């Protein structure tokens, strides 16, 4: 995996501008919300973020993938202000689960999600190296 960072661009914080990968198995993980076994354990943005990311990592493990194999995360957030207010707690949860691996990321503000209690939904793409 090679991080793509054009020299004239400012270095991003908390994500990568691009990633190039050779070989491996590409894994696509559908949008995950912050529930566990179909039950909502958290109502706040940061709590739901933590669980959604944990769900992604649990699904990725089925392909023998690890956090560092994730190349893209797309977040769909219902409340931009809640997202911004939760950045510190989200960052702490992110580092706990992902370490210092920062894939490409996009955050999209949406008017609603199908699961009405969901504050966000995250989908992921990973490339698991051939063994």
What kind of feature is each model-predicted range?
Residues 1-71, 77-131:
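N-terminal presequence-like segments and the immediate start of the first folded domain
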């Amino acid at each position: 995996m090679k991080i793509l960072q054009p020299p004239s661009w400012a270095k991003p914080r908390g994500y990568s501008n691009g990633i190039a990968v050779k070989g491996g198995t590409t894994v696509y993980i559908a949008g995950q919300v912050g529930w566990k076994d179909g039950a909502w354990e958290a109502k706040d943005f940061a709590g739901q973020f933590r669980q959604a990311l944990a769900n992604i990592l649990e699904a990725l493990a089925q392909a023998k993938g690890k956090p560092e194999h994730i190349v893209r995360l797309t977040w769909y957030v219902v409340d931009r202000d809640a997202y911004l207010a939760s950045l510190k707690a989200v960052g702490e949860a992110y580092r706990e689960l992902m370490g210092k691996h920062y894939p490409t990321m996009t955050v999209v503000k949406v008017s609603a999600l199908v699961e009405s209690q969901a504050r966000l939904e995250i989908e992921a793409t990973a490339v698991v190296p051939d063994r």
